[in-house]
């Protein structure tokens, strides 16, 4: 019959909170303290009723739990043991059948707790397998006690290297006695650089002796005792070990204690590996009672495999703590320091558990596998360590992110200073700051490509071609055609690929792209710093479209995107300054020669010969056939020499390739050579619009003033009209001769005007062909029209108002998001 223990807290000496381990729930202990009455333990009737009757130390000990009985948590007689049929579960526990309490699955930890399977608000200890679990308040008290053992005196050593050696030992396995089993490949590491570990050999031996002497004498060798004495002994040993390493930093403490465990585990494995072939180790194994153990491979492997799980969790948590102490001191906050003592305590305690299992290997019976209690003990502690590690890792990642963001911000501000306020005498220093840690470039095409230093750009004008790897083919194609010897004498081009993330596929694409480039290419662009990427995105406006940043020989930024000037005027735009851009526009007239410059050499030659040139576009093949037929008839009737050129539309896709093929096959007219040239034609028109807007912005003209300024700018009006034509799929046409006026109209209107040639041909002798045609088209303008104008993607230059090219009224503004896949 089970006896009821009555407790008198006044007669017992005060015990340390961690030393005072009870099977009584903490909530019940609180009620006991508040009870005015007094309880005294009843004398046991016999030794069988109370096997600990003779024990009189100062520990608060409850009777060992009978597996057929469960704790009565609601009973007024606290601490009593009652039959399982009278079990009343505590509200915080799940209601489980008493017969399966020993197979209870571990509960998950709460989000704010680190000490065990208890979350916020769970004040009582859980009891599993007769083994009490500390509550959260216990952990706080325990952490305070751990802190009292901590008095570091700035002793530092290479904890990472020593932990690496320890981890190598932990990963070793007991060799199989089966000769047919495959042997693991041997990889020998060089530990020649680890001579500094000799300093700690004596301390590691001392820790090992402390664990062996106290742990084993306390009955822990087999890891089978579950009484309060067993746990209290392990707790005492934990603090004894912590006292030995009191003068070391937290991470160093752990590595030294784990080293002691590694020595014990390693010696055990050496005996297991060589006892059958080496007389000395065979004798040692005999003294240690190991030969029979080594013959029971299944049980031995099961025991050590379970132990290695806990070892790995200890190494993982220790690695995290080492990483934490690599942070700058001001970033090791309370989020770490409040929990690291707890982590240290449990790792040292888990070392004792592992020692128990390793030392206890010689004590288990023939073919006996690990008991449920032993497996559960490892599982519980692994769960605890992983919980702590997950929390510390999360805090560590947050701290690393904060540090990295601070570094990026500092480097970003430094780059702003470099390219705005600092005066340089050469272009190389600012380039080195922007591109570091990359310090070399590629130069030359194909097999002649070689590595050179950045200093080859000394005292040169440099164009930084900044792009990603996905949207640069067209720019590269056109730049290659423009990169003549005259260009190379004026400035150098340096390609800087910019991507937030790099993959192996990106590396391969980069290699393929830069192999055929004749200009300079940044080496290893994947190493470009995040601050540099942020700078070119935010300060220089790089988004999706490539940009061309112009630097003078002293590193001063001439233009954050010289592409519009390059597309419009090519090398004549040098040195790409705002002043140069203004001068070029002041000298430029709107004519067909300017419109097609650099895009269609054939048409330029025809202009030189005095022929009329008609540019047209659209996607309606029937209209194209009718339009070209009308023009042939008019040209023949008017006795003029006419060349027609199909220029497609803006953002050409593969969908217009069949149209180009039909035009060529049926010999309807000329076309631009390929899709790249069509893209370049319309990109030049977009660049004209962007350049004009940039001029207005540079002069501080905006709002209504900008609108009025645009009204005066005939070139800008014509550019807007062209962009309106190119953005639609409908047909349109434009005709001119050399430097004469240009006549333009939408497709149906133009076709109607050509069909009515008989009505206006009489005016040709007096007005001229182009003026007569233009006047007739103006008379045929429909009273109602719908004109659309899609702005090109530019660096944030969006005018508030745009004038309609047909009626000169202000156009309504809409937002268009478009995705066209072909």
Swiss-Prot record:
GO terms for molecular function: protein homodimerization activity. Disruption phenotype: No visible phenotype under normal growth conditions. Expressed in phloem sieve elements. Pfam families: SEO_C, SEO_N. Signal peptide: none annotated. It comes from the Eukaryota. Residues 28-62 have a biased composition (Basic and acidic residues). Residues 25-62 are annotated as: Disordered. GO terms for biological process: phloem development. Can form homodimer. Scaffold protein required to form the phloem filament matrix in sieve elements. This is Protein SIEVE ELEMENT OCCLUSION A. The lineage of its organism: Eukaryota, Viridiplantae, Streptophyta, Embryophyta, Tracheophyta.
């Amino acid at each position: 019959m089970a006896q009821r223990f009555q407790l008198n807290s006044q007669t017992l000496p005060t015990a340390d909170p961690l030393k005072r381990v009870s099977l009584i729930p903490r909530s019940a202990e609180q009620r006991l303290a508040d009870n005015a009455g007094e309880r005294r333990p009843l004398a046991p009737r016999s030794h069988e009723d109370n096997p600990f009757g003779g024990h009189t130390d100062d520990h608060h000990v409850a009777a060992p739990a009978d597996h057929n009985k469960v704790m009565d948590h609601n009973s007024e007689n606290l601490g009593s043991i009652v039959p399982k049929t009278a079990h009343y579960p505590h509200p915080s526990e799940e209601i489980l059948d008493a017969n399966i309490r020993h197979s209870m699955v571990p509960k998950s930890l709460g989000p704010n707790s680190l000490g065990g399977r208890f979350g916020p608000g769970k004040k009582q200890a859980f009891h599993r397998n007769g083994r009490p679990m500390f509550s959260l308040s216990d952990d706080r008290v325990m952490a305070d006690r751990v802190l009292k053992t901590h008095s570091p005196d700035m002793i530092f050593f290479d904890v990472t290297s020593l932990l690496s050696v320890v981890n190598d030992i932990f990963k070793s396995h007991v060799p199989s006695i089966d000769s047919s089993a495959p042997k693991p490949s041997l990889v020998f590491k060089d530990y020649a650089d680890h001579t500094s570990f000799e300093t700690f050999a004596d301390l590691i031996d001392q820790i090992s002796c402390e664990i062996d002497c106290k742990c084993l004498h306390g009955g822990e060798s087999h890891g089978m005792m579950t009484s309060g004495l067993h746990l209290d002994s392990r707790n005492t040993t934990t603090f004894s070990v912590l006292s030995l390493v009191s003068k070391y930093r937290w991470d160093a403490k752990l590595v030294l204690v784990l080293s002691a465990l590694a020595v014990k585990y390693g010696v055990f494995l050496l005996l297991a590996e060589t006892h059958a072939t080496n007389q000395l180790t065979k004798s040692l194994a005999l003294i240690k009672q190991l030969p029979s153990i080594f013959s029971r491979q299944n049980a031995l492997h099961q025991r050590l495999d379970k132990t290695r799980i806990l070892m790995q969790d200890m190494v993982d948590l220790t690695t995290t703590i080492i990483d934490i102490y690599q942070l700058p001191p001001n970033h090791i906050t309370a989020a770490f320091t409040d929990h690291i003592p707890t982590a240290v305590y449990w790792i040292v305690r888990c070392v004792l558990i592992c020692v128990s299992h390793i030392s206890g290997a010689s004590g288990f019976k023939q073919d006996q596998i690990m008991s449920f209690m032993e497996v559960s003990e490892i599982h519980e502690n692994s769960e605890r360590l992983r919980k702590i590690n997950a929390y510390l890792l999360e805090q560590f990642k947050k701290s690393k992110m904060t540090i990295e963001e601070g570094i990026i911000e500092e480097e970003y501000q430094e780059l702003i200073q470099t390219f705005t306020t600092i005066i340089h005498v050469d272009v190389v220093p600012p380039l080195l700051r922007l591109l570091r840690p990359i310090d070399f470039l590629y130069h030359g095409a194909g097999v002649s490509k070689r590595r050179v230093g950045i200093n080859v750009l000394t005292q040169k004008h440099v164009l930084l071609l900044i792009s990603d790897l996905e949207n640069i083919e067209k720019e590269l194609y056109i730049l290659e055609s423009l990169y003549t010897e005259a260009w190379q004498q004026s400035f150098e081009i340096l390609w800087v690929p910019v991507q937030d993330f790099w993959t192996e596929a990106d590396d391969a694409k980069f290699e393929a792209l830069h192999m055929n480039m004749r200009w300079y290419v940044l080496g290893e662009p994947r190493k470009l710093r995040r601050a540099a990427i942020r700078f070119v995105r935010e300060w220089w406006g790089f988004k999706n479209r490539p940009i061309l940043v112009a630097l003078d020989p002293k590193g001063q930024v001439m233009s954050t995107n010289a592409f519009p000037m390059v597309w419009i005027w090519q090398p004549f735009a040098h040195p790409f300054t705002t002043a140069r851009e203004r001068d070029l526009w002041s000298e430029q007239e709107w004519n067909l020669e300017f419109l097609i410059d650099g895009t269609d050499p054939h048409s330029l030659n025809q202009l030189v010969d005095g022929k009329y040139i008609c540019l047209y576009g659209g996607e309606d093949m029937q209209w194209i056939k009718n339009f070209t037929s009308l023009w042939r008839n008019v040209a023949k009737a008017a006795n003029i020499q006419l060349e027609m050129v199909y220029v497609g539309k803006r953002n050409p896709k593969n969908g217009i390739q069949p149209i180009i093929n039909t035009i060529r096959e049926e010999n309807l007219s000329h076309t631009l050579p390929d899709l790249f040239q069509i893209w370049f034609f319309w990109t030049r028109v977009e660049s004209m619009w962007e350049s004009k807007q940039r001029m207005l912005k540079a002069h501080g003209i905006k709002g209504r003033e900008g609108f009025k300024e645009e009204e005066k700018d005939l070139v800008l009006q014509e550019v807007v009209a062209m962009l309106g034509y190119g953005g639609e799929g409908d047909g349109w046409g434009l005709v001119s001769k050399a430097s004469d006026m240009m006549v333009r109209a939408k497709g149906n209107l133009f076709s109607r005007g050509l069909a009515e040639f008989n009505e206006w041909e009489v005016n040709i002798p007096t007005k001229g062909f182009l003026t007569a045609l233009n006047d007739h088209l103006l008379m045929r303008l429909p009273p109602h029209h719908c004109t659309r104008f899609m702005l090109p993607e530019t660096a944030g230059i969006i005018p508030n108002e745009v004038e309609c090219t047909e009626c000169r009224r202000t156009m309504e503004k809409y937002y268009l998001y478009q995705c066209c896949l072909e």
